[in-house]
Swiss-Prot record:
EC identifiers of the protein: 3.6.4.-
Keywords: ATP-binding, Cytoplasm, Cytoskeleton, Hydrolase, Nucleotide-binding
Family recorded in the similarity comment: Belongs to the actin family.
GO annotations of cellular component type: cytoplasm; cytoskeleton
Keyword Methyltransferase listed: no
Organism: Schizophyllum commune
Superkingdom field: Eukaryota
Enzyme class label: hydrolase
Pfam families: Actin (PF00022)
Localisation per UniProt entry: Cytoplasm, Cytoskeleton
Protein name: Actin-2
Molecular functions per Gene Ontology: ATP binding; hydrolase activity
Catalytic activity: ATP + H2O = ADP + phosphate + H(+)
Length: 375
């Protein structure tokens, strides 16, 4: 492959799509993974009257559109809409011709094989890419942190995973998955704010709550103690100005919403929290590598951005781990984009260039080639 041609790296998350060029240190385009369609035909007269809108444009016109996320819990559920998002990525965001650049896509751990094949097929047949590769998101996050062995806690908008990785390969038997992530925490906050007498119902209003969550929520080191503190003083209260100018006050909701992450039973789920998830994953790995895993617990994804989350993880895991085990939580400041950054690093390595699955190989073997070339 010619050195002059940069590969395109696309990280398709449940909430946001991150896209750019291999070798760059940050994605060029970050936009919501949404496709919007007019609720009522005829309402959009005078606008460019398209039958669908993608990303920021859909977000801006959300009042008159029905918004859909084609990726749910990390897995593509609507391929037509997914194709629209990829089309938008190439032609409107990056403004490059797909047939001129190899592309590296990302996928959730334990993704169904058929999903991977469909991705491969669309890239080669619809977009005519010259070469293609798909990588597991958590593995890329680990590369971005400069490691090849460790356990990644990856939590975005749609799904949370713990993925142990040894010498660059994920250990599928030990991967744990929790269908609780950013979108669910936003819903929890909606619930708590409703109890305070503020209602948020439309998809547009929920975006406001997401903003409140990202700006004001945090993880308490000791949840019960924090509740007592919040009840005794107003020091934890913060004000937030809504788009219409109304000011709302938010108190213990600031840490009650993210607490679900550590205690899913609050949301009626039987699963253990994220600290239990990490512990279970490590216990399923070989004794010989557990020490290395405990010493390299890497956070990744937007939902790990809450202040206080690292200290709480450190505390909970130190209580669970064997007494002589050193627990180290790594929370890189750029972890919102670490999957993309890892992809950018990987696709620009000279040693990676023979890992691409070429158009010729695809034409000879069909979509199944992806399982042989992309481990």
């Amino acid at each position: 492959m010619d050195d002059e041609i940069q590969a395109v790296v696309i990280d398709n998350g449940s909430g946001m799509c991150k896209a750019g060029f291999a070798g760059d240190d940050a994605p060029r385009a970050v936009f919501p993974s949404i496709v919007g369609r007019p609720r009522h035909h005829g309402v959009m007269v005078g606008l460019s009257n398209k039958d669908s809108y993608v990303g920021d444009e859909a977000q801006a016109k959300r009042g008159v559109l029905t918004l859909k996320y084609p990726i749910e819990h990390g897995t593509v559920t609507n391929w037509d809409d997914m194709e629209k998002i990829w089309h938008h990525t190439y032609y409107n965001e990056l403004r490059v011709a797909p047939e001129e650049h190899p592309v590296l896509l990302t996928e959730a751990p334990l993704n169904p094989k058929t999903n991977r094949e469909k991705m491969t097929q669309i890239m080669f047949e619809t977009f005519n890419v010259p070469a293609f590769h798909v990588s597991i998101q958590a593995v890329l996050s680990l590369y971005a942190s400069g490691r090849t062995t460790g356990i990644v806690l990856d939590s975005g908008d749609g799904v949370t995973h713990t993925v142990p990785i040894y010498e660059g390969f994920s250990l599928p038997h030990a991967i744990q998955r929790l269908d609780l992530a950013g979108r669910d925490l936003t819903e929890r906050l909606v619930l708590h704010l409703t109890e305070r007498g503020y209602t948020f119902t439309t998809s547009a209003e929920k975006e406001v709550v997401r903003d409140i969550k990202e700006r004001l929520c945090y993880v308490a080191l000791d949840f019960d103690q924090e509740l007592i503190t919040a009840a005794q003083s107003s020091a934890l209260e913060k004000n937030y100005e809504l788009p219409d100018g109304q000011i709302i006050t938010i108190g213990n909701e600031r840490f009650r919403a993210p607490e679900v992450f550590f205690q899913p039973s609050f949301a009626g789920m039987e699963s253990g929290g994220i600290a239990d998830l990490v512990y279970t994953s490590i216990q399923r790995c070989d004794l010989d590598i557990r020490r290395e895993l405990y010493g390299n617990i890497v956070m990744s994804g937007g939902t790990t951005m809450f202040p206080g989350i690292s200290d709480r993880m450190q505390r909970e895991l130190s209580n669970m781990a064997p007494a002589n085990m050193k627990v180290k939580i790594v929370a890189p400041p750029e972890r919102k984009y670490s999957v993309w950054i890892g992809g950018s690093i990987l696709a620009s390595l000279s040693t990676f260039q023979n890992m691409w699955c070429s158009k010729q190989e695809y034409d000879e073997s069909g979509p199944g080639i992806v399982h042989r070339k992309c481990l």
